[in-house]
Amino acid sequence: MTRGNERTGFRVDPGEFRVCPLRAHAFLHDVPLEDVWAIRLRGGGAGRTIQDVRAVFIAGVEAAPAIVTGLIRLRRRIGALLGWDRQRPGWHAESFVHRLSPTDRAQSTAAPGIPDGRLSLLYRFDKEQLSELRNGTVHAFSSLSMRPTPGGYLAYLAIYVKPVHRFTRLYMAAIAPFRRLLVYPAIIRKVERGWAERYGDSRVG
């Protein structure tokens, strides 16, 4: 198991994540797991839900450092120039929304298919949500989940990537250093601090 009790957000071994009782494991059983990040959420009290985590996460993205927002803008400009993000008629048929069971739909607290930032929501349960993104480079999935700990909660951000052509792996390899060294660590620090500020715990450095 990953050791990081005194650290802020850190990457987690996939095996540690897979033992968590999440719907995403079965739902995405045939989709490669790219990486997993743990987010330490100190405080918060009982009864917090994934919607609370999502709200702080969105605020963390919006408050990301200039280098991170600059990288995001650069990716969007390149995507617009090369047509990566232009929606194609056939992509709807590839959406994993068609995998949702009647139970998934009944238990989701938000309607499948609604926008979730630049992604599309598949389901949102009390402690877990899953969204997808289909563009010209990847068919990606973002799993956000949480579990209680003695001092608050531990959230997991897991990224799954289904290749859409041979370019997908090259693309993911090219952006991996930026994602893993700059983007995710910076956003996760903002999320952890934002959670501490919102719920009255100032121990996050």
Question: Language-model segments: which ranges?
Answer:
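Beta-strand/loop substructures that line and gate deep hydrophobic ligand-binding cavities in soluble
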Residues: 135-173
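Active-site-proximal cofactor/substrate-binding loop regions of enzyme domains
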Residues: 204
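Hydrophobic side chains in beta-strands
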Residues: 39-41, 133, 159
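Short hydrophobic helices that act as membrane-entry/anchoring signals
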Residues: 69-80, 168-176, 180-183
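Hydrophobic-ligand binding "helix-grip"
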Residues: 106-149
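Hydrophobic ligand-binding cavity/cleft-lining segments
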Residues: 2-107
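Intrinsic-disorder/low-complexity, polar/charged segments enriched in Ser/Thr/Lys/Arg/Asp/Glu/Gln
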Residues: 34-38, 128, 154-156
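A conserved amphipathic terminal alpha-helix motif
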Residues: 172-201
